[in-house]
Amino acid sequence: MAELGELKHMVMSFRVSELQVLLGFAGRNKSGRKHELLAKALHLLKSSCAPSVQMKIKELYRRRFPRKTLGPSDLSLLSLPPGTSPVGSPGPLAPIPPTLLTPGTLLGPKREVDMHPPLPQPVHPDVTMKPLPFYEVYGELIRPTTLASTSSQRFEEAHFTFALTPQQLQQILTSREVLPGAKCDYTIQVQLRFCLCETSCPQEDYFPPNLFVKVNGKLCPLPGYLPPTKNGAEPKRPSRPINITPLARLSATVPNTIVVNWSSEFGRNYSLSVYLVRQLTAGTLLQKLRAKGIRNPDHSRALIKEKLTADPDSEVATTSLRVSLMCPLGKMRLTVPCRALTCAHLQSFDAALYLQMNEKKPTWTCPVCDKKAPYESLIIDGLFMEILNSCSDCDEIQFMEDGSWCPMKPKKEASEVCPPPGYGLDGLQYSAVQEGIQPESKKRVEVIDLTIESSSDEEDLPPTKKHCPVTSAAIPALPGSKGALTSGHQPSSVLRSPAMGTLGSDFLSSLPLHEYPPAFPLGADIQGLDLFSFLQTESQHYGPSVITSLDEQDTLGHFFQYRGTPSHFLGPLAPTLGSSHRSSTPAPPPGRVSSIVAPGSSLREGHGGPLPSGPSLTGCRSDVISLD
């Protein structure tokens, strides 16, 4: 029970990081707040406290409270008998400093044997930094050194010192480049790098959390923070080498000091190193890539045959493969086609553009398959070099099953440019030219403005005026009907329209008028109707009522200047009305005669002369109807 209480005391002193490590070691869920994690850890301790879990708790506790090394004076204090003072005179016991009370003394003599101090981290671990393509290492100023946590404080601090030899100093000074209007820069630089303290493989740059660096007492600028991926996440900096040449003392006699502050993380140590490097450009790397040579084209042909080989298990067989000769980065024709050895595709990208892109922002990712394509794995494709040299007028090729290729030239389709449609006389003239009118027919046409003194907007080309005498036939009226026109006293009226010029037949025949089918089909019973006769004319504005009695017409006759007959719009309906009235109504009384104007045929058929009908009205003159 005493041992269980001690373990419980250790668990309750853990932070969130220790609780998560303990629960992860035991295979439990390690997500949640601190009180939830603590409850899970205590439940683990009570339910199944295996020896491995107990050892893990003790290990975490030793790391949480590292044992302080005691000096001779501290050991003499602990070896004094109880009740005695350090000077040996009797008196009250002097309190022992809390820092001298190690975890072993707090747990008792039984557990002191089990408590061992953590193994110290090596000062210079066997850490190897991953080489950078744009930097050539000239020398190592500080070997990879461990940034180990030395106390239980949240923030750690470490001090480092390095010095430059006269030869190194001379290399830096001779590489100085001063550009007009810009600050001086050095091609050979003093470079500071951070990484994880791991010896399994070459390490990439990795910044500790909350990193601050001072070089010779001056704060060193670091890369800016990246935008957080989620709310509440701790901002991080992009890990990359730091150029500390502007802050270094360029002297062979005065050393340089570096002070590093960072936040410690449980179970994770970091390493620091300083190098003397020479910065390279994209052009230099391209020359080095060319110096490596061009890959044999047979390798690419073998890859093509492998891709186009028919798979017996697949129902779809690929017989050809299209590849573009345009770079996916710059959308331009390839100059130096290259790809990584780890890429499984044939599509290449331009080496110069790829190196320039990574010089600005080193990602080293293939633009085709988005996989890692480091500089060391880049190769120049010899087959694509042959294709680019032999085919300069195409941007796409097609590979066959045997490894051969053929250019894919774009099909040039003759596209007829349709001019915008013209309106009015311009459109008519343009259509006449397009239809190939003979030169002798292209005479100057007399232009007549149809909008002058015209009241009709629906007619494009008005026909010539013709005088059409209209007659009407009397039909019997209904008994007691009122409002019919009488046949004996119906006065004649003239439909008046403004004077308009007429168009010659030669002009109408020369115009290329097209036949347009009707948008809506008309029935057989209304195809003979003259729809223009239903338009409103002056007689409808100023004349009396269409159907009225003889007495009322005589009474109101002096108020109207013009009197017109309604035959121009009731004519088409007269045959139908007449037949119905004859069959259903008797003859009208002799004292009162009603009639409806009804021509024998449609107005369109009667343009040439009088229409045949029944007896005409007495004292009625022919009406002049204009078809405008």
From Swiss-Prot:
Post-translational modification: Sumoylated.
GO cellular component: cytoplasm; glutamatergic synapse; nuclear speck; nucleus; postsynaptic cytosol; presynaptic cytosol
Domain SAP per the UniProt entry, residue ranges: 11-45
InterPro entries reported for this sequence: PINIT, PINIT_sf, SAP_dom, SAP_dom_sf, Znf_MIZ, Znf_RING/FYVE/PHD
GO MF, any single term: SUMO transferase activity
Biological process (GO), any one: positive regulation of protein sumoylation
Classification via CDD domains: SP-RING_PIAS3
UniProt KW Zinc-finger keyword: yes
Pathways per UniProt: Protein modification; protein sumoylation
Cross-link entry Glycyl lysine isopeptide (Lys-Gly) (interchain with G-Cter in SUMO2), positions: 46, 56, 230, 307, 466, 482
Region named SUMO1-binding: 450-460
Localization annotation: Cytoplasm; Nucleus; Nucleus speckle
Tissues in which the protein is found: Expressed in kidney, heart, spleen, brain and cerebellum; weak expression, if any, in liver and lung.
Region spans: Interaction with CCAR2: 1-200
Root EC class: transferase
Annotated stretches, region: Disordered: 571-628
Short name of any one Pfam family annotated for the protein: SAP
Main location: cytoplasm
ZnF (SP-RING-type) ranges: 312-393
Domain notes: The LXXLL motif is a transcriptional coregulator signature.
Family, per entry: Belongs to the PIAS family.
Function as written in the Swiss-Prot or TrEMBL entry: Functions as an E3-type small ubiquitin-like modifier (SUMO) ligase, stabilizing the interaction between UBE2I and the substrate, and as a SUMO-tethering factor. Plays a crucial role as a transcriptional coregulation in various cellular pathways, including the STAT pathway and the steroid hormone signaling pathway. Repressor of STAT3 signaling via inhibiting STAT3 DNA-binding and suppressing cell growth. Repressor of MITF transcriptional activity. Enhances the sumoylation of MTA1 and may participate in its paralog-selective sumoylation.
Quaternary data: Monomer. Interacts with PLAG1 and ZFHX3. Interacts with STAT5A; the interaction occurs on stimulation by PRL. Binds SUMO1 and UBE2I. Interacts with AR, BCL11A, HMGA2, IRF1 and NCOA2. Interacts with MITF; the interaction inhibits the transcriptional activity of MITF. Interacts with STAT3; the interaction occurs on stimulation by IL6, CNTF or OSM and inhibits the DNA binding activity of STAT3. Interacts with GFI1; the interaction relieves the inhibitory effect of PIAS3 on STAT3-mediated transcriptional activity. Interacts with MTA1. Interacts with CCAR2 (via N-terminus). Interacts with TRIM8.
Protein name: E3 SUMO-protein ligase PIAS3
Species in which this protein is naturally found: Mus musculus (Mouse)
Record gene name: Pias3
